[in-house]
Amino acid sequence: MKSSAEIRNAFLEFFEHRGHTVVPSSPLVPANDPTLLFTNAGMVPFKDVFLGKEQRGYTRACSSQRCVRAGGKHNDLDNVGYTARHHTFFEMLGNFSFGDYFKREAIEYAWEFLTRTIGLPAERLWVTVYEEDDEAADIWLNEIGVDPERFGRIGAADNFWSMGDTGPCGPCSEIFYDHGPEVPGGPPGSPEEDGDRYVEIWNLVFMQYDRDAEGRLAPLPMPCVDTGMGLERLAAVVQGVHSNFEIDLFRRLIGAAAALAGLPEDSDNASLKVIADHIRACAFLITDGVVPANDGRGYVLRRIIRRAVRHGYKLGIDEPFFHRLVQPLADEMGGAFPELPERQALVERLLLQEEQRFRETLEQGLKLLEEDLRQLTGAEIPGETVFKLADTYGFPVDLTADIARERDLTLDMAGFEACMAAQRERARAHSQFKVQHGEGEQFEGESHFIGYDQLEGHGEVLALFRDGRSVQTLSAGEEGMVILDQTPFYAESGGQVGDQGVLETAGGEVFEVRDTLKQGEGHGHLGRLREGRIHVGDRLRAQVDAETRWATALNHSATHLLHAALRGVLGTHVQQKGSLVAPDRLRFDFAHYEAPSTEQLEQIERIVNDEIRANRAADIEHMAYDDAIETGAMALFGEKYGDQVRVLRFGEFSIELCGGTHVERTGDIGLCKLISEGGVAGGVRRIEAVTGDRAVMWVQRTEQRLVQVAETVKASPDNAAVRVAQLVDRLKGQEKELERLKQKLASQAGSDLAGQAVDIGGVKVVAARVDADNKALRDTVDQLRNKLGTAVIVLGAVAGDKVRLVAGVSKDCTDRIKAGDLVRQVAEQVGGKGGGRPDFAQAGGEQPEHLETALASVESLVRDALGLE
């Protein structure tokens, strides 16, 4: 009996020996693909290759790709633990051809691997093809020799695959394993196909078409093959078990979880299966850079962790346990995926922290649920309960649904959505929080800012606000504002964004600070309480996020250098009109009467970086406002200053009044790169820039693009601009030559079409489709009118999914037939409209499939216009 590792290795070796490049598994977070939460299929890393956007050094590949299906369109989370084959995490074995081999080889490889390498009996395999795919059917039946009794044709719902609504697509061929008549279920395509007897183990996708927006299929110039076979399913077949949870990959994990729960190692418990599945997904998600969060990928991870923890609680495990399953997982899969043991300590630490946080509210939430269930008169859990569990106790909705399912209950999702809508309404009110927090309730006290010299401190809660109103307590899940008597958090002002970080009670309750705002003389920490409660009078530890503060400081100091450089190059009339100083960039608006030249911008950037390399110290003084102005410090017009001000000086180069946070020396900035310049209003320009590591990355990306362009035009980076100019000149020449050839073709087309003219009542009529652009169509109409004399001409062309129509009528006919009327009647038949002069008119349409019929109607329309039968 082969182990899962042996099956994986056998698959990769089989295809490697047949010219395939073995490609390591990509991370679960797709690179440069915002449309996907996670890598959910083996073809995802090759998506751009299939779309023709990326070239690789091979045309055949194979992989064992780790995948997650939880959240988003593909979500198996709710089914895990209740079926034999659903998983949040699984491995997809796949072989791929990018314009190399096609159906015959793909089918032969699949059959050979299953029947010879793995040794599955042919009489146990059942094959399906797309109902219209005669080519694949012929290969299976007449070349492979599959028994027609174990072969079927299936419709598009199951056996036609597409990457999206448009783009590459094609028929599938699926291979099923028959567990035998003792297992209930029927063959694919039968009414009993959902039974467990026939299990799909391999799907071969033949991408041979390109579907356009109208649903039309055109042959792909480079047909491709994309196959996928779940390792866990194949292992179940090979190891002679009916459930994926009985294979070796899961036995060790289920045994370890059972030991933690004090259960026998061979327990057949759904909760053990859930835990074993979820540790795989969670460990590999963290390995690939996902961390628990309240949105996006991080929230999906949090949901999976909390579902596993709840099942552990259900088994009676009364202490953090989930992280202890990482070691047996690494023992089982670390050989195939070495990145897991490399990051094992991080995975264990994050899982432990997340479980500890959730356990603090898990028991309370379950108690609330039990109380509500005791009062329940029907079979539906109220939406208010579902919402409270999610909002206050951190229960993801699917976790509550899981509990309901175990008790044959359902959720009132309409009621839940109503609660969510009300919360969103409150959130919209919070969006005005920055401008005016609480209409009528303002903080009257004062916060002492201690954050110039330290990023951590302690402060007493002076006030709490929720929904704009002063409250005495904030509870878990609630949004609000916390004001301390002293804080290291910088509050948004002077263009610098407010700090982020956390406030923490002595008991470990965490308030996540997403922004810090001025509230009168106080610093308001705006955010959400993760768990527990905070009361007025509590003493909290305040911790600023050091990374974002430092990145913001780089940009703020660079803003001062930029301001001085602008005044030095463009003139002292330059005044700051606004700014944004954030961790990822700086934006500076300034008064200037024209766009700076390229040379001026280069000079400004050079001066700023000269000052950075000079490594000047940031000297900070507090002095009287008048004294500061007398020393040459710049004050911003419209800004309010007190009697005492803070002056920031970088040598003699820059002296400004500023209350923001900054670097200690200009050299800390590293590099400043201007990335855009433009106008935002009359007499106001805007520059955006990046600093530090982000500036380096921006330069590197730009260099990469230059190298790519140079390679494309076959030149060195130094000569790329000259080469591009040469190519543009050549292109212009070719466009002129193309125009000449179009004229020649139009003349030829006119001669050819003239011979097709039909005489209707003394009028020569031509209606034809001509593949040409608008100008060529017009020229051809003119050619035909000159050749035919008394004539009516209607020409049509298709460009993509659009129709072009041009009509011409000789002047001696325009009293009986108007070109505008005629082309309008034809255009209506192709879903369009148009018009023009009596002797010449144009139109367009949206239904190219009706063009031939529309053109065929021209003769009848001319007869009607001439009054002929």
UniProtKB/Swiss-Prot annotation:
SUPFAM superfamilies assigned: Class II aaRS and biotin synthetases (SSF55681), Putative anticodon-binding domain of alanyl-tRNA synthetase (AlaRS) (SSF101353), ThrRS/AlaRS common domain (SSF55186), Translation proteins (SSF50447)
GO cellular component: cytosol
InterPro entries reported for this sequence: aa-tRNA-synth_II/BPL/LPL, Ala-tRNA-lgiase_IIc, Ala-tRNA-ligase_IIc_anticod-bd, Ala-tRNA-synth_IIc_core, Ala-tRNA-synth_IIc_N, Ala-tRNA_ligase, Ala_tRNA_ligase_euk/bac, DHHA1_dom
Domain of life assignment: Bacteria
Key words, A-Z: Aminoacyl-tRNA synthetase, ATP-binding, Cytoplasm, Ligase, Metal-binding, Nucleotide-binding, Protein biosynthesis, RNA-binding, tRNA-binding, Zinc
Biological process annotations from GO: alanyl-tRNA aminoacylation; negative regulation of DNA-templated transcription
GO molecular function: alanine-tRNA ligase activity; aminoacyl-tRNA deacylase activity; ATP binding; tRNA binding; zinc ion binding
Enzyme Commission number(s) from the entry: 6.1.1.7
Binding site for Zn(2+): H556, H560, C658, H662
UniProt subcellular location: Cytoplasm
Signal peptide residue numbers: none
Cofactor details (free text): Binds 1 zinc ion per subunit.
SMART domains found in the cross-reference section: tRNA_SAD
Transmembrane portions of the chain: none
Catalytic reaction annotation: tRNA(Ala) + L-alanine + ATP = L-alanyl-tRNA(Ala) + AMP + diphosphate
Required co-factors: Zn(2+)
PANTHER family, per the entry: ALANINE--TRNA LIGASE, CYTOPLASMIC (PTHR11777:SF9), ALANYL-TRNA SYNTHETASE (PTHR11777)
UniProt xrefs under HAMAP family: Ala_tRNA_synth_B (MF_00036_B)
Family of the protein in this entry: Belongs to the class-II aminoacyl-tRNA synthetase family.
Annotated function: Catalyzes the attachment of alanine to tRNA(Ala) in a two-step reaction: alanine is first activated by ATP to form Ala-AMP and then transferred to the acceptor end of tRNA(Ala). Also edits incorrectly charged Ser-tRNA(Ala) and Gly-tRNA(Ala) via its editing domain.
Domain remark text: Consists of three domains; the N-terminal catalytic domain, the editing domain and the C-terminal C-Ala domain. The editing domain removes incorrectly charged amino acids, while the C-Ala domain, along with tRNA(Ala), serves as a bridge to cooperatively bring together the editing and aminoacylation centers thus stimulating deacylation of misacylated tRNAs.
Protein name per the record: Alanine--tRNA ligase
Organism: Alkalilimnicola ehrlichii (strain ATCC BAA-1101 / DSM 17681 / MLHE-1)
